[in-house]
């Protein structure tokens, strides 16, 4: 309802909830299917809009930062960029439990040419190295997992989003490219790469510039998600009011940064 607004009938909301779980199931099916797919099939299933923004950055010798929501099938695009586009691709991912599941996903992503960095203390150095080596860097940025992010307005409510994309762009000059990869009804993926979000120093304090740019990214992510809200796989609480509501019914969920 945050995405669609108050005027949308309840039955439509319920229908989209069902479609969201169907989309999430498709994500998992594709995840297990992609390693067995021939490169030609990955190429034929991909419609890439805005890939010129990526080429422009790499040709200039700097790795672009693709800022993505947890939506659709971003891994298909990552494999296409690596196997068909010939790019070096680095993705920062959330560690999964149990560790065997994380190791499985890391292995199949690396098998198809992606470099995987686990979110954690060593991630910063790894992503700086990737940008300097002109890798395409994929950052999922619609959820503040560590609880150390920037407060923004996101779909009409205050929450926090990761500071990493804006901070990296300010420090390296890497372009920030809002990106989303949508499931097509007939199979395959349509990936949309938008023009760069403006990145420049304006304030005396770096934190103020990071806040401004992160808010701009939040607005860009809103637009991408609204194109296909049923494909947004946000299956966890993401706003303070979500946690408050769960606590009110006796089902508390750890807040970001809490064990």
Describe the residue ranges of each PLM region.
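Catalytic core of membrane glycerolipid acyltransferases/transacylases, capturing the structured
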Residues: 60-121, 147-154
